[in-house]
């Protein structure tokens, strides 16, 4: 059996944020969510989150994930003290305890799986993850023999100058035999510079301690301040971009684009500079997104072009052109072959196949059939000051430039709305509707004014 415990009680003082450190966002997910995901493939029987600072807020945010047990650490008196809080919860548990840090979000699932696998194969009481760092300042040093048996871990602040020359560092990630660990946890002492209980001290108390050296030291980067958060964001973005490049996606200027873990791209997709993807996005084959676009929680079909536009919680069919400077808001559903042009906003509306809204229009709370041609400056006036109302436009209809459709209204199929009209009544199939003042021309007006 396997239990996973994530240390998530710290204040994160150096972040200087009202948000708990483990809830800071990184490429579309919180730090602690990424840590939990790294152990997901192991399918642990127990998942425990040790909380302290703003515990209620952390629990509220993470509870929807399901299957989490929250354990309170109050006060926060070190990593050893945190794990001591698990003793009541794991009473009678027999198996391994994997201990992860809630602020180490770049850890790959393959690394976590290798740690647990090695621990089980070696029969060790504890196996810890280690990394060799060019600059190990601030990290605990791991001392081990040639066979990988660990003799001790000494925190940086407690090291002598000679001990600090060792660059094998403790990543703060452990796989324990829980029964063995539970026996030594009560023996921890605060006899150190910080006066805290260190989980690292249990390593020297256990008969057999082994270590696994991680291949990529960036995986165990911890986050304590905004600069480190930005560094981890850059590393994770690079990892995501490289993954999708290997899957057949072209980035014209990779470092100017950002992705989230929930993105999915088809083959031969091209991403132009300054384009950003947030949340869960699906982009179909042969589409080109950007430059200067934001796609968030949206679905985009094949052979689609999106230029200098914002697409949020919307669905776009195949062979569609969007932009420049279009805004697709939540519940916009754009059918195959549509054209949404410059300075067009679409909200909570369905556009049938082949419909064109080329210029300067607002389409809100509307349903447009197939091959509708919306003239420049057409507005669906959906709000009466109290409620929103629907506009229905049938297939093959046309609206002239600068027309306003005052909802609720139903325009039939093959209907035409004259330019400059304000339409307040339903329009039948095949009808022409004109709703504007008759033009009055006064000859010689300019001369009379003089």
Swiss-Prot record:
Q: Quick one: which residues bind UDP-N-acetyl-alpha-D-glucosamine? A: 7-10, 21, 73, 78-79, 140, 155, 170, 224, 329, 347, 362, 373
Origin: domain of life: Bacteria
Instruction: Report if keyword Protein biosynthesis is assigned.
Output: no
Gene Ontology molecular function: any one: structural constituent of carboxysome shell
Annotated stretches, region: Pyrophosphorylase: 1-226
Ligand binding (acetyl-CoA)? 376, 382-383, 419, 436
> Which GO CC terms are listed, alphabetically?
carboxysome; cytoplasm; membrane
List where in the cell it is found.
Cytoplasm
Q: What is its main location?
A: cytoplasm
Q: Which cofactor does it need?
A: Mg(2+)
Q: Which reaction does it catalyse?
A: alpha-D-glucosamine 1-phosphate + acetyl-CoA = N-acetyl-alpha-D-glucosamine 1-phosphate + CoA + H(+); N-acetyl-alpha-D-glucosamine 1-phosphate + UTP + H(+) = UDP-N-acetyl-alpha-D-glucosamine + diphosphate
| HAMAP family in alphabetical order | GlmU (MF_01631)
User: Which family is annotated?
Assistant: In the N-terminal section; belongs to the N-acetylglucosamine-1-phosphate uridyltransferase family.
> NCBIfam families, per this entry?
glmU, PRK14360.1
UniProt function note: Catalyzes the last two sequential reactions in the de novo biosynthetic pathway for UDP-N-acetylglucosamine (UDP-GlcNAc). The C-terminal domain catalyzes the transfer of acetyl group from acetyl coenzyme A to glucosamine-1-phosphate (GlcN-1-P) to produce N-acetylglucosamine-1-phosphate (GlcNAc-1-P), which is converted into UDP-GlcNAc by the transfer of uridine 5-monophosphate (from uridine 5-triphosphate), a reaction catalyzed by the N-terminal domain.
Question: Which protein is depicted?
Answer: Bifunctional protein GlmU
Protein encoded by which gene: glmU
């Amino acid at each position: 059996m396997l239990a996973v415990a994530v240390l998530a009680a710290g204040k994160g003082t150096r972040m200087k944020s009202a948000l708990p450190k483990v809830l800071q966002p990184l490429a579309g997910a919180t730090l602690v969510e990424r840590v939990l995901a790294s152990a997901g493939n192991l399918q642990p029987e127990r998942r425990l989150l040790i909380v302290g600072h703003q515990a209620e807020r952390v629990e509220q945010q993470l509870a929807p994930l399901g299957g989490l047990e929250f354990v309170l650490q109050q006060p926060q008196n070190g990593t050893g003290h945190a794990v001591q809080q698990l003793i009541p919860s794991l009473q009678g548990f027999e198996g391994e305890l994997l201990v992860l840090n809630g602020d180490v979000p770049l850890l790959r699932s393959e690394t976590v799986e290798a740690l647990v696998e090695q621990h089980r194969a070696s029969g060790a009481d504890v196996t810890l993850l280690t990394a060799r760092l060019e600059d190990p300042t601030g990290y605990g040093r791991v001392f081990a023999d040639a066979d990988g048996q660990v003799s001790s871990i000494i925190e940086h602040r407690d090291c002598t100058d000679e001990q600090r020359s060792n660059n094998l560092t403790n990543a703060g990630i452990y796989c324990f035999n829980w029964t063995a660990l539970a026996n030594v946890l009560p023996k921890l002492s605060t006899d150190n510079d910080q006066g805290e209980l260190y989980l690292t001290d249990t390593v020297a108390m256990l008969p057999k301690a082994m270590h696994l050296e991680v291949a990529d030291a960036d995986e165990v980067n911890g986050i304590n301040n905004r600069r480190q958060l930005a560094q981890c964001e850059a590393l994770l973005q690079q990892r995501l971009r490289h993954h999708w490049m290997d899957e057949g996606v072209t980035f014209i200027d990779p470092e100017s684009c950002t992705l989230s873990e929930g993105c999915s791209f088809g083959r031969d997709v091209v991403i132009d500079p300054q384009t950003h993807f947030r949340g869960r996005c699906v982009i179909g084959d042969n589409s080109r997104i950007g430059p200067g676009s934001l796609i968030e929680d949206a679905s985009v079909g094949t052979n689609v072009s999106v230029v200098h536009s914002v697409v949020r919680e919307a669905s776009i069919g195949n062979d569609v052109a969007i932009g420049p400077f279009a805004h697709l808001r939540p519940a916009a559903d754009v059918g195959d072959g549509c054209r949404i042009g410059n300075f067009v906003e679409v909200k909570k509306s369905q556009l049938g196949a082949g419909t064109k809204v080329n210029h300067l229009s607002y389409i809100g709370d509307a349903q447009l059939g197939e091959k509708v041609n919306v003239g420049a400056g057409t507005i669906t006036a959906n709000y009466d000051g109290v409620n929103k109302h629907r506009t229905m436009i049938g297939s093959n209809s046309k609206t002239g430039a600068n027309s306003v459709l005052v909802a609720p209204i139903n325009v039939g199929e093959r209907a035409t709305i004259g330019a400059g009209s304000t339409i307040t009544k339903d329009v039948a199939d095949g009808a022409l509707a004109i709703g504007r003042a008759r033009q009055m021309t006064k000859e010689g007006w300019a001369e009379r004014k003089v």
